[in-house]
């Protein structure tokens, strides 16, 4: 029986997750409709359920990366994503600051206090994005281009001299650990940013934002498939 790789296992999870995502977006669109009569409790429940669904993706991804081995590089350019989805990748996922652009186009009833709060979150997010990107760039530069080197190692094209193989293996193990750390830090910022933004918004505004985000993602997905 063939052994299933970590990335293949996650790809299977992702396909199921994507089906649920489409269902959630339909629910968000229904509740976002101005003609839909809905209670605040129903709005809060859907927002909470969608955020749990969103976090599940990153929880499963974290587990998969922890046991990925050489497959860790698949998570930086995931084969389960479409070509259009890959166009917006930032350290293996969406750039956290994208949420603020979506707010601008989807939520038109922000109070002045909310605007100030969101601006503060945006600036902090931008600062952390720069910090993470700087560290990630240094990590890549430290080994040349590991994302190109590893596929060659897999098929035996890269020939090392006697005594160099153990050193290269050790270096690659350190690299994998650092790559996982970089991805998890980026994923944490993605989750924290969305969480902070939703805390500022009321349930109705959150539904509008999450609907816009969900539909934007599905458009990218469907265009590239």
Swiss-Prot record:
The keyword NADP belongs to this UniProt entry's keyword annotation: no
Domain DOG1: 7-225
Alphabetized UniProt keyword annotations: Abscisic acid signaling pathway, Activator, Transcription, Transcription regulation
Keyword presence, Transcription: yes
Swiss-Prot/TrEMBL GO biological process terms: abscisic acid-activated signaling pathway; DNA-templated transcription
PROSITE patterns, per the entry: DOG1
Single GO MF annotation: sequence-specific DNA binding
Function: May be involved in the regulation of abscisic acid (ABA) sensitivity.
Protein known as: Protein ZW2
Organism (species): Arabidopsis thaliana (Mouse-ear cress)
């Amino acid at each position: 029986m063939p052994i299933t790789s970590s990335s293949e296992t996650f790809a299977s999870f992702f396909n199921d997750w994507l089906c649920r995502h489409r269902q959630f977006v339909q629910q968000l669109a229904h509740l976002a409709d101005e003609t839909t009569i809905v209670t605040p409790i129903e709005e809060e429940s859907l927002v909470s359920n969608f955020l749990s669904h969103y976090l599940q993706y990153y929880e499963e991804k974290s587990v998969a990366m922890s046991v990925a081995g050489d497959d860790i590089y698949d998570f930086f350019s995931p084969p389960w994503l479409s070509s259009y989805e890959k166009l917006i990748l930032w350290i293996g996922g969406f750039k956290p600051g994208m949420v603020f652009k979506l707010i601008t186009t989807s939520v038109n009833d922000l109070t002045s206090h909310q605007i100030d709060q969101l601006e503060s979150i945006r600036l902090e997010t931008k600062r952390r994005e720069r910090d993470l990107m700087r560290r990630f760039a240094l990590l890549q530069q430290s080994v040349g281009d590991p994302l190109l080197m590893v596929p060659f190692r897999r098929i035996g094209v890269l020939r090392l001299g006697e005594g160099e193989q153990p050193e290269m293996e050790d270096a690659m193990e350190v690299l994998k650990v650092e790559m996982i750390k970089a991805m998890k830090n980026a994923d944490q910022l993605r989750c924290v940013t969305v969480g902070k933004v939703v805390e500022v918004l009321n349930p109705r505004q959150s539904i509008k934002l999450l609907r816009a985000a969900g539909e934007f993602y599905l458009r990218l997905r469907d265009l590239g498939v």
